[in-house]
Design a protein with these regions (language model features):
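Flexible glycine/serine/alanine-rich "lid" or loop that lines and gates the nucleotide-sugar donor pocket
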Residues: 140-141, 245
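N-terminal organellar transit peptides
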Residues: 1-124, 128-131, 146-148, 161-320
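Zinc-dependent metallopeptidase catalytic helix centered on the HExxH motif
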Residues: 141-160
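Catalytic cores of alpha/beta
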Residues: 135
Length: 320
């Protein structure tokens, strides 16, 4: 029994230590300033070299939240606003490769894109490896949605949070934990108290509210009746072919052909350049630490884990 207790305590200590290390490294990293820069070095921030103007390509990748290794909300919103006000910018082409993220940030991007369109400019969206949940939510702001034939999309639904009841485990290893609080539902989701039926109902109500918002976004932007959109909104992932058959996207094609279509149908084949924008974060101390300690590719894996584990719910997120 004593050995079992010691093992349990050791596990908790290890988990706590890893969480503290990742949290500290993440805190160091998020102080990096947001940058607006083209993908290719030879592309300078000179938007008047083509008198006819340019199409802006914005890459949206990684988990959608305030900021992480590959995503920065402030950068994205400010870039969209800047492009709206730039007379040389004629349209926006989104490259979306994300499993989604928080409801707040996903909706903020959607609204920023809708505001961009008030200038009379068009938006086309191209879905990469995955454009699910919040990624699809953002796609709905586009006038046309294209996808690669191997794209996974859809996952129209909401996660309001996860409850972990550790009271039995703590009791077995001899640890007592109590949170002093006022208000019977103030301590929801704390590991030291089980979730009550009333609390589950509260969270389900929040979840349902954001779900209806998502369904309405799909219905409005995909020219569907609400009932039709809801029938497609059970949280499942769709292949590109399934999404096309169900009216969730407009075409399965390449990025290059989407740009060609954009120029043909929106600008009568005008010779517009395509200027690329993506959030680029410097290789940081935590990246170096992870690569040295755990091997190549580990920094990306740890970032994905930390981004999702620190997610602020509710979320439009496909988790697989």
């Amino acid at each position: 029994m004593k050995k079992q207790k010691n093992s349990g305590i050791l596990v908790l200590i290890i988990i706590a230590a890893i969480s503290l290390i990742l949290g500290a490294l993440n805190f160091i990293d998020i102080k990096q300033p947001a940058k607006i820069q083209p993908v290719h070095k030879e592309m300078k921030l000179n938007f008047n070299r083509n008198k006819k103007g340019y199409i802006a390509k914005i890459t949206i990748e990684g988990v959608i939240q305030e900021r992480n290794r590959s995503y920065n909300q402030e950068w994205l919103i400010s870039t969209i606003k800047m492009l709206k006000d730039d007379p040389s910018n004629k349209a926006l082409a989104l490259f979306i490769d994300t499993p989604g993220g928080t409801v707040y940030e996903a909706d903020e991007v959607y609204l920023a894109l809708q505001n961009y369109k008030t200038s009379g400019k068009k938006i086309y969206a191209y879905q990469g490896h995955i454009a699910a949940s919040g990624g699809y939510y953002i796609s709905c702001a586009a006038d046309k949605i294209y996808a690669n034939r191997n794209t996974l999309t859809g996952s129209i639904g909401v996660i309001s949070g996860s409850s972990f009841d550790m009271t039995e485990l703590l009791s077995k290893i001899g640890i007592k934990s109590k949170t002093i609080h006022a208000g019977k539902n103030k301590n929801m989701f704390n590991y030291n108290e089980p979730l009550t039926a009333e609390q589950e109902k509260i969270m389900q109500g929040i979840c349902d509210s954001y779900y209806e918002q998502f369904v309405n976004i799909v219905a409005q932007n995909r020219n569907m009746k609400n009932a039709e959109a809801k029938a497609l909104s059970d949280g499942r992932i769709y292949t590109a072919k399934q999404a096309l058959d169900n009216g969730l996207i407009d075409s399965i094609d390449s990025w290059e052909n989407m740009i060609a279509d954009m120029k043909k149908f929106e600008f009568e084949n005008a010779n517009l350049s395509v200027e690329e924008f993506s959030y680029k974060k410097d290789f940081t101390f935590s990246d170096i630490f992870m690569e040295k300690a755990f091997g190549t590719g580990s920094s990306e894996a740890f970032e994905k884990f930390f981004s999702e584990s620190s997610m602020k719910y509710p979320a439009y997120l496909a988790d697989f």
